[in-house]
Amino acid sequence: VHWKLTGKRVLGIGDAAGMFPIDTTKADYNQEMVDKFDELVAPYGFSWKLRDIMPKALVAGEDAGVLTEEGAKLLDVTGKLKAGIPMCPPEGDAGTGMVATNSVAVRTGNVSAGTSVFAMIVLEKELSRPYKEIDMVTTPSGHLVAMAHSNNCTSDLNAWVNVFKEFAEAMGMEVDMNKMFGTL
């Protein structure tokens, strides 16, 4: 989306970390792993190297381009939205949630519970070893973050509450969903 709005192939470092491991000392993709990837796919004879196809990783505050005329037209077909608006490095909901809860400093964290649930903890140092349950990402400013994620959170709860709602309605009861969620 950002590329279509600005013409720049960039990502916020937090989103970039979800795509490929980051070297937090350089605020960039982990070059050792980039080299290993290129080495592994070399026998296939691709015409590109990994860095050729990955968006540039940017930390918060870096120049991520401006809204172009073409981008403005995608957002507003009436033409009232003007080009030239500065754009920040694009981040996803996890990075946005960290900023919104002021959980971007070392030894802070946040929990987000919705359809899925995840905990984000800003680390002082790298973990001693990999854990399959933990994804390593970064804050929008490039600090290392351990993220534990589950795809199911409120989706299961919603399904069960719906079962009880349907039962109550079948029994002729009026259902207040706030009370139903609070009770269950």
Question: Which ranges hold each PLM region?
Answer:
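Active-site core segments that coordinate phosphate-bearing ligands/cofactors
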Residues: 2-15, 20-47, 61-184
